[in-house]
């Protein structure tokens, strides 16, 4: 079983790029339970699709990792960083997932 979410964030894609780089530095690219993460800019924001092994691990990352990275970013990066942007999260029913390079098929 997997847990999939679509996340819309009303912030510029440049903010995503900066945060994503900080997140990779913090985690080394590994977050427990995260199977796939894809992001792209929209007209006024950015959207993310994530597939997790469980809702609990996604909730833990949102509670523990994301705020730590945001706090580090706001303390060290140049630029105007205010409060962390609000995420609008929609849970999706995943019908299937195949990641050949990870030998994963659900």
Locations of regions flagged by a protein language model:
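Short S/T/G/P-rich N-terminal loop/turn motif that feeds into the first structured element of a domain
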Residues: 1-71, 75-106
């Amino acid at each position: 079983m997997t847990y999939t979410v679509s996340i819309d964030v009303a912030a510029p894609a440049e903010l995503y790029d900066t945060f994503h780089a900080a997140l990779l530095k913090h985690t080394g690219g590994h977050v427990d339970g995260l199977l796939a993460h894809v992001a792209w800019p929209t007209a006024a924001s950015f959207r993310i699709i994530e597939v997790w092994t469980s809702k609990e691990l996604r909730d833990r990352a949102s509670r523990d990792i994301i705020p730590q990275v945001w706090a580090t970013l706001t303390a060290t990066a140049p630029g105007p960083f205010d409060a962390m942007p609000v995420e609008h999260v929609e849970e999706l029913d995943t019908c299937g997932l195949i990641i050949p390079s990870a030998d994963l098929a659900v």
